[in-house]
Amino acid sequence: MPSLSAADHSVSPPKIHIPRDYNAAYDLIERNLSAGRASKVAFLEDRGRYTFGELAERVNRFGSGLQAMGLAMEHRVLLALTDTIDFPTAFLGAIKAGIIPVAVNTLLTSRDYEYMLFDSRARALIVSEQLLAQFAPLLPNHPFLKHVIVSSGGASGHKAFRDVLAKGLPEFSPAPTTCDDPCF
């Protein structure tokens, strides 16, 4: 297991220690669970509230689900997600799996997204259903893209976000990342 970061607040500015074996998603989630916050609200959206315990399970399921789809350490996934629980789930799940999330603004053009897909060499696109039309013309000829995962659905024959969660594991060990590995 990776170690957690530490901060010495007795000095100004605080001295931060990030250990060699480090995974940012593991640090964020485990720090809150260890502090007894599993039942505390971590994320609030129109559809409901999610506790740190619920977020931890979603992160585990999504990270392991991405690995089950063949995504591996240092592969990239492009995230074009609106402000729902699926964003922190995908972002942190990818990081915990050692996969690099490339989060993009949801107000861009298809041309902008085309550049980002090619430049990042994303192997998967994780997209909110209402943004899928912006990506539709880009998908057939993309040389690196292997998977399209749609939040709030599974439109047009693409994989549904909820299915990746359902097939993932509730317990999932973090990838053996280090403090100087690419993270996002």
Which sequence ranges carry the predicted segments?
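AMP-dependent adenylate-forming
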Residues: 27-54, 69, 153-156, 182
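Conserved ATP-dependent adenylate/AMP-binding module captured primarily in the ANL superfamily
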Residues: 106-138
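Hydrophobic/aromatic beta-strand patches that form the interior of the parallel beta-sheet core
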Residues: 102, 126, 147-149
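Flexible, non-catalytic linker and terminal segments flanking ANL/adenylate-forming cores
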Residues: 1-22
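ANL superfamily adenylate-forming
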Residues: 130-183
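Adenylate-forming
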Residues: 29-32, 55, 59, 66, ...
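Conserved AMP-binding/adenylate-forming
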Residues: 48-50, 65-110
